[in-house]
Amino acid sequence: MNDKRYMLIIAICLIFLSILVYSIHFLIFGKVDYILSYFLLHLAFVPIEVLLVSLIIEKILDYREKKKILEKLNMVVGSFFNSVGEELLKIILEGDVGNIRDYLKISDEWNDKTYEETKKLLMNYDCNIDIEKIDLYKLKNLLERNKEFLLRLMENPLLLEHESFTELLLAVFHLADELHRREDLSNLPKSDLDHLKNDIIRVYKLLIIQWLNYLMHLKDNYPYLYSLCLRANPFDNKSIIIEEDDK
């Protein structure tokens, strides 16, 4: 039985049940005018019921569903940064010739406004890198070692709801493919290095913004994980995982 036929049968049964109840009421009390008055009174309330169900309640349910999806998405993003993202940032940072570290010395005092202002600044930040300072073999090994993991992430249907993260993964896959096709990375011509540089910068820009978004999520929902990420901040050379006891 298809869904349309099933819904039609349900609708007919409900209408029949309503007619049956009204008929029983008429047989017992015999008041047609009361039945008509009662029917019209409730019929007038139907548009309000439709408003409540279709607009307000539906919006509430839709919001709750999106919140659950977002929560699962951020778990996926978190696994990416724990397995690949943070190490990828560290490798690319070795070649950053700008002052991006000055923008991202994040502390416990940062609030949502600080994060949003920093994101706006970094969206216009000139992510210039010196590719000679980046260990291309290390970068290649990282991406090839995690190829299966990245493929599983791409297969996750939740990514349909997260365009920016999907864009980042596609950029990472493209960079991995470019590096994979070059066996000898030590003697590349300048034109080839420039091509790889552009691919790395594309990943770098997307990675920074995604990392900030992830930190904002942790700050609002998981303070203990947020604290760990701050202590492991790849942009802060003074960050330490293990805090010493005060003497």
From Swiss-Prot:
Keyword Membrane in record: yes
Chief site of localization: membrane
Cellular-component GO terms for this entry: plasma membrane
Membrane topology: Multi-pass membrane protein
Transmembrane segments: 9-29, 37-57
Keywords: Cell membrane, Membrane, Transmembrane, Transmembrane helix
Localization of this protein: Cell membrane
The protein's name in its UniProt record: Uncharacterized protein MJ1433
Natural source organism: Methanocaldococcus jannaschii (strain ATCC 43067 / DSM 2661 / JAL-1 / JCM 10045 / NBRC 100440)
Highest classification ranks of the organism: Archaea, Methanobacteriati, Methanobacteriota, Methanomada group, Methanococci
